[in-house]
Each structure stands twice: as structure tokens, then as C-alpha cells.
Design a protein with these regions (language model features):
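Catalytic-loop region of hydrolases
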Residues: 2-15, 27-181, 304-307, 437-443, ...
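Alpha/beta-hydrolase fold active-site neighborhood
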Residues: 49-54, 308-455, 498-500
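Active-site-proximal cap/loop segments of hydrolase catalytic domains
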Residues: 163, 169-224
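A catalytic-pocket lid/entrance helix-loop region that shapes and gates access to the active site
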Residues: 166-177, 244-309, 342-345, 359-370
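Alpha/beta-hydrolase fold nucleophile elbow
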Residues: 227-236
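Conserved strand-to-loop "acid loop" that flanks and positions the catalytic carboxylate
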Residues: 459-464
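Conserved alpha/beta-hydrolase "acid-adjacent" motif
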Residues: 466-471
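Catalytic histidine-centered segment of alpha/beta-hydrolase-like enzymes
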Residues: 492-503
Length: 530
């Protein structure tokens, strides 16, 4: 799922994409005796599984900087963060076989007298790193932050962990199916090509890329930290990871916050399918905003006129790629790429995001008329990242999703869904229903996780979330009767706590993290005026 903002990426996690307690808080003392007792309990929990050496390891905490050019590492060092690698098996069915490392970071509790325990972070994606996140999360937690060891980790094959390189020449495989059958056929070839590259470069590890294995890694991290239980803050996809952990390791979790949550049934290779209505509604709301600023952006003086502008841009890109930028910063955008930009750019309803998106659409509108355009540094960087910015991590998101659930294999299945979706959702339908890269990768080794155990947790959701829909958060809440739902009414936003600036949401989450007590009933906050 798409994370939403650059701030999201640094603070708690595109992906645009939080946590639960079943028992009172962990003992606050950090004495040697307490640590030894916890380590002994951890060792017993892993006894006989062949995993003892992983659970019994102790991180070698040290500097986060990996060299003179590691700016992020230096910033973490300055913030008092320590970093380490945790050893985990590549294949949990063969714990004596090949090993990989998972990078972790720690901002230690400073209020040791009232220490609660360790809280792990996941920023969504899937494939989002979190080693960089503890300083920002400490600020978000306000007075509660100093009571936790805040633990960031880069999931297996992400960021500073043992990498997985799919050899992709692009930053993401998310595209629209376009306006024609020919465009769709190009997408079929594009996705098959990406799958073939990933299999050729990383085929030996692909069977071990999955959320269930990441959850197993989380439990090893818990053991390595010497904790009986862990707390957790997970955004977007991180909510799915958190849910999976509670199902696989009951009794090992404390305070879990799942923000921008998704029900397990809605997660998988077609994870945007079902969000068409919310994304089109978000576009419509933005169009009404832009219409009031026609003098600034020139996109139309009514909501309908602005939406017509979007349709004309897509139609023009179908006739021939739009040229945006100049010189070395020139990009060609066709009808499979432009709709994706409409969805990715309209990530929330803050004035800053709406203005930035309006500026981007203005550029595309000029290009659709054949006029020269100039890109802002931010838009140019976003285009480069998505369209040409291949990196070792580019294929990790797809690899994880494909390792979690099987996808339909027949391209006709997707084409029929695309055609059915066009009338009601002309922009989002062909994006949400487009063929998945997973259609060309092997079937996952394990069955998808089912919610069979109740779990106490706080689920946070906005009614207009365009990524993981409010309906999906409600479904997860219903599957976990002991959970409580914190709703933000009136917001078109994915991921809220500490990121959206809603005091009501932030204070209620922090109260839960501080006390370990869920509210007696579901609670509702209201969007603050801009």
C-alpha cells in the first residue's frame, strides 16, 4: 500500500501506510536480575525449536553510522540512537541453515523508574524501513516516550537488513491498465518482465519473503531484547504485520496500535482493489478545493470542470506519451502512468498536499496541450523514483505481497474486472484492478494468515482513508471483539497518529500507550479546521 508523505516515511514510515495489551505493563525495573529472569523465560519459550541461538543472542549495540557518507546514521548517533544487527534464519523450517540479518535501532528509555518496555515500529509498505524512526516517534509520544525503549527495525530484505535485489529499473510496479486493450497488454508484459527479473536475481530467497517470516523475526527481536512481551506501532501494511504477530505469538504482545488498518481478507496481491470509491471520492473533494482556486491553478472553476481536466490529461496520454520537464530531467508519461500519479499525488486532504498536487496537475495539463513544462524539484524526484529509480529495494514490496497470498494467473480475470470498474471509477478502477506482478511469481509456501484469536488492540482509522479503507478497519475491528476503534471523522487521510496533527487522536493514543488501558468503548475524534 502506498505510503502517504515524506514525513510519514521519516516519522513512523508510501505507501503512503497502530497496538495492544492483554496484560499489565512490563515490570519497570531494569536490573540485572530482571533481565536474567526475562532471558531465561525467553530461552524456555524457544526451547526445542532449534531457534535457541537466535532468541538467546544479545544485540551488539553501537554507532548507527556506516561510514563518513552515512548522513542518516550520523543523525541517529546525534539523537542518541544505537544500532545493531539481529541474526535470523532465512528459512525457519531449517534454523541451522543459511542466516540473514535484520537491522534494528534503539532509543533507550530515559525514565527508567517508570519504564514500560520496548515498542517496535513498522511504517508500512510493505517494505518500509523503520531504523530511522525512533527519534520522531519519541517526539510523537510526548511524555510517554521516555518510558519506552523505542525500537526501529528494517524488515528482512529491506533497508539496512540483508538486501533483496530484484534488478528492477523502476521504483514501483503500481500502474494503471490504461484506456485500451493494447495498454493493458503492455502492462502484462511489463509485470511479467519484472517478475522474471526478480526470479533471476533473487529466486533462492523469494520463498522466504513473507509477512509470517517477518513476524517470526519480530519475535526473535523480542527475545534478543530480553522482553517477555513487546508493544507495537504499525501503520498501513504494518497493521497487517501486527495482526499476524498476534495470531502467531499470542501472549507475547502488550500494547498494540494499528493505524490505517487493513483486514487480512483485504490484504494481498490486489490490495488496492476495493478502494476505488474512496480514492475517487478523495479526487472529487480535491477537485472542489482546486475549483475554488481556479485563478491560481487554472484547472477549472467547478468541481466537474476540474475532473474533466483530469480526464483530458489521461486521454491525451493515451494518444501519445506526455513530455514533462526539460533536458536531463525529461519524462515521458503514458496512460498507464498518469492515473497512478493522480492517486499517489492526492494522498491526503491537508492544504499543503492539495496545493502540491494541484501544481503537479497544472504541469500535466500543460503537457497535454503540447506546451513546455518545468518540474519542481519535488515532482522531478517523485517521477524519477517511481518511473526510473530502480534500487535494490524496488521489488521488495511486491516480493512480500506475492509471498503472502496467491494471485489470479489468467490476465483475462484482471481485464474483466478492469472493464467492469471503468464506468463507475474511470481513473481508479484500472489502477486498482490492474494485473499484479504476483501473477507471474510462484505460489506462496504458506497459507495466508487467518484471524482465529481475539486480541486487545487500538485500531485507528479515518473515515475517508483512500488507501486502507475505513470499511476494512471496521472489518478488522469486528474480527477482534476485544479491540477498540478510534475513528477520525471527516478526514481523507491515510495514517493519523503523530502525522496528521489531530490532537484528539494523538492524545488518546498516547494515553493508551501510557496506561495500557483501552477505552471502555469505541471513540470518535473530529477533523480539526485547516
Amino acid at each position: 500500500m502506498l505510503t502517504t508523505t515524506a514525513r510519514r516515511a521519516s516519522a513512523a514510515g508510501l505507501a503512503l501506510a497502530a497496538a495492544l495489551t492483554t496484560t499489565p505493563a512490563l515490570a519497570t525495573a531494569t536490573s540485572t536480575a530482571a533481565s536474567t529472569s526475562t532471558a531465561t523465560a525467553t530461552a524456555k519459550s524457544s526451547a526445542g525449536t532449534g531457534l535457541d541461538r537466535y532468541y538467546n543472542q544479545r544485540p551488539g549495540w553501537g554507532s548507527c553510522a556506516k561510514g563518513p557518507d552515512d548522513a542518516m546514521g550520523r543523525d541517529l548517533d546525534k539523537a542518541g540512537v544505537q544500532c545493531a544487527d539481529v541474526l535470523v534464519p532465512l528459512d525457519y523450517a531449517d534454523p541451522r541453515g543459511r542466516t540473514i540479518t535484520v537491522a534494528i535501532s534503539r532509543l533507550k528509555a530515559t525514565d527508567t523508574r517508570h519504564r514500560i518496555g520496548s515498542i517496535l515500529l513498522n511504517n508500512g509498505g510493505p517494505g518500509g524501513p523503520a531504523v530511522q524512526s525512533p527519534p520522531d516517534v519519541r517526539k510523537m509520544m510526548k511524555k510517554t516516550g521516555p518510558r519506552y525503549d523505542i525500537i526501529g527495525f528494517d524488515p528482512r530484505f529491506v533497508g539496512r537488513s540483508t538486501p533483496l535485489d530484484c534488478g528492477w529499473p523502476v521504483g514501483t510496479d503500481i500502474r494503471s491498465a490504461g484506456l485500451s486493450r493494447a495498454s493493458f497488454e503492455r502492462q502484462v508484459a511489463f509485470k511479467k518482465g519484472l517478475a522474471d527479473k526478480c526470479r533471476a536475481t533473487s529466486g533462492s530467497v523469494l520463498p522466504h519473503v513473507s509477512t509470517r517470516n517477518t513476524a517470526r523475526d519480530m519475535d526473535v527481536i523480542r527475545g534478543a531484547l530480553g522482553e517477555r512481551k513487546i508493544s507495537y506501532l504499525g501503520y498501513s501494511y504494518g497493521s497487517y504485520l501486527g495482526t499476524v504477530y498476534t495470531q502467531m505469538f499470542p501472549g507475547k504482545y502488550d500494547r498494540f496500535v494499528l493505524d490505517g488498518a487493513i483486514a487480512p481478507a483485504d490484504y494481498g496481491p490486489r490490495l488496492l482493489k476495493g478502494s476505488e470509491r474512496e480514492n475517487e471520492q478523495a479526487l472529487s473533494a480535491w477537485a472542489a478545493w482546486a475549483a475554488k482556486r481556479h485563478a491560481t491553478y487554472g484547472l477549472g472553476s467547478t468541481r466537474a470542470a476540474v475532473l474533466d481536466t483530469l480526464d483530458r490529461i489521461v486521454a491525451a496520454s493515451a494518444r501519445g506519451p506526455l513530455t514533462v520537464g526539460k533536458g536531463a530531467g525529461t519524462f515521458q508519461l503514458d496512460d498507464t502512468q498518469v492515473p497512478f500519479l493522480f492517486i499517489a499525488g492526492n494522498s491526503d486532504d491537508t492544504p499543503e498536499t492539495r496545493a502540491s498536487f494541484a501544481e503537479q496537475v497544472s504541469v500535466l495539463a500543460k503537457a497535454a496541450k503540447g506546451q513546455p513544462t518545468e518540474l519542481s524539484p519535488e515532482f522531478a524526484a517523485a517521477l524519477k523514483s517511481a518511473l526510473t529509480g530502480g534500487s535494490p529495494n524496488s521489488g521488495v514490496q511486491a516480493a512480500i505481497i506475492c509471498g503472502d497470498k496467491p494471485a489470479p494467473r489468467d490476465p483475462e480475470t484482471y481485464w474483466k474486472d478492469i472493464q467492469r470498474s471503468r464506468a463507475e471509477h474511470p481513473i481508479m478502477g484500472p489502477v486498482a484492478n490492474n494485473i499484479s506482478t504476483c501473477a507471474f511469481l510462484d505460489t506462496p509456501r504458506e497459507q495466508p494468515t487467518q484471524v482465529r484469536r481475539d486480541a486487545k488492540m487500538l485500531i485507528v482509522a479515518a473515515t475517508g482513508d483512500p488507501r486502507t479503507t475505513y470499511r476494512s478497519s471496521l472489518d478488522l475491528h469486528k474480527q477482534l471483539p476485544s479491540s477498540k476503534l478510534l475513528t477520525l471523522k471527516g478526514a481523507n487521510r491515510h495514517a493519523l497518529y503523530g502525522l496528521y496533527g489531530n490532537d484528539c487522536v494523538d492524545n488518546k493514543v498516547n494515553t493508551y500507550l501510557a496506561t495500557g488501558k483501552l477505552p471502555k468503548k469505541d471513540e470518535t475524534c473530529v477533523k480539526q479546521a485547516d
